[in-house]
Amino acid sequence: MYIIFAYLYVITAMSLVETPERSSMLGAIIGDMAGSIYEFKNIKSRDFEFLSEACEPTDDSILTCAIARALIDVKGRGTHLQRATVYRMKEYFLCNPLPLGGFGGKFFNWAIYNLEEPYGSWGNGAAMRISPVAYVGNSEMEVKLLSQIITGTTHDDPEGLKGGEVTALAVFKALHGATKEEIQEMVRSYYPGEYSVEELHKTYKFEPSCQKTVPEGMQCFFESEDYESAIRNVMYIGGDCDTLGAIVGAVAGAYYGIPEWIQEKALSMMPDYMVEDYEDFKAMYMDK
């Protein structure tokens, strides 16, 4: 009898423990904000104030929200997604042309001159903004297709398309219960090689390409214990910290969930339109 009561007590206590909300979109925005002040001034340390008052969303978060809004517009259907993505990214750029760190030069010209064709980019912007598609696709094949459509609006170089696809698949797998080993196996199938956070801490520098950002960022996730430690690993290796933060934050947010105190702090720092985008996307796709 005592064993039964003890068992029931443990089960009840566990049910009262609030599980961190798993969110790749919010995880990406928070990771971007956390790294925003270290993009051009790396600290190569895990010891820093998480989301200090100086942190703010950069182009990474702005375009993540633009893609989320485009996916809301088309209600999960691939029809007109390319057109909606182009429209929303240009709209969000024009409404927020000078974020902390600025937009990439090629994207800036594409948006400001209202160009229609993609510009052949292999840059890590393809991976920083793609996380919302993981909630919309119902299978890995659908996630790949959505990623290709969205990424191809600007980053039609094979390396750009690959970087967006790997990130989207990693988030999808994390949301659907894959282990780190399974996610790592997928990432290594795209980017063969061995990495370690300690080695990256010693040697890694700012890199704008997908092929020199995505696998390094994924290693920060693989060697983490929770959402916060994954983001701290990003600042420890340095590099393009806001973009790495967005990529790592998306996967870690989907895999671990995000502690409530971090969510509340981030939401209080985000502009109103960004909170609205997140809440609308959450209502349509995350809470279904």
Stretch-by-stretch model annotation:
Residues 5, 12-288:
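Structured, active/binding-site neighborhoods that engage oxygen-rich ligands
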